From Swiss-Prot:
Gene Ontology biological process terms in this record: L-histidine biosynthetic process; L-tryptophan biosynthetic process
EC assignment: 5.3.1.16
Name of protein: 1-(5-phosphoribosyl)-5-[(5-phosphoribosylamino)methylideneamino] imidazole-4-carboxamide isomerase
Lineage per the UniProt record: Bacteria, Bacillati, Cyanobacteriota, Cyanophyceae, Oscillatoriophycideae
Pfam families: His_biosynth (PF00977)
Amino acid sequence: MEVIPAIDILDGKCVRLYQGDYQQSQVFNDNPAIVAREWVNQGATRLHLVDLDGAKEGKSVNLSTIETILNDIAIPVQVGGGLRDLETVSNLLKIGVEKAILGTVAVEKPELVSELCQSFPGQIIVGIDARDGKVATRGWLETSEVEAIALGQDMAKRGASTIIYTDIHRDGTLSGPNLAALRELAESVEIPVIASGGISSLTDLLSLLSLEPLGVTGVIVGRALYTGAVNLSEAISAIGSGRWQDVPPNFFA
């Protein structure tokens, strides 16, 4: 299972939010590129970047910061936040982003997701950010009536390569992943699912291994890395491709 460090960018700085609340942001580094290099040095094989300003504004805001990171490192990067039209996604992929993450448009313009998946096969990820099973949009500032499972199934049919599932109530809280919701989603779609939100310890990461046979192929870790609750190198050793043993699928059931 791939351990993917998250770098959330707000006003050009590396921050973490609490439950997606822009009013509860904590700056961890003024220079996200330094953070990116640190995660690469610790063994990261992929980075997850979120343009928080972009998510709120509906357009890419921190493009220059993202480009600096891309020029600094040699591992794949996936980016989300404010990607709501073909031109914005195209520009992002042109500068070297491997995969673009769509959120709001999956709910508001599902036909655009189909178009983007056809234009950029294998490069479109759909981020499903859920609050009590319902999908949140526009930088988590609004909650729709769309069910997360139904959206996941629809996006898989439209050609999404992967789904990132974030439980908003757990994001930035270090309260552990929502295993039940992840299991339900993974069982309902035929494409890989990446877990996000709430990771607080190696135990949390190990608990996700029980879902790997269902298609949960990665986990995004944010606050726990920044507070030191999780050491990236240790996490990769514990659940990554080089781990020394598998955890039985029913170990944490």
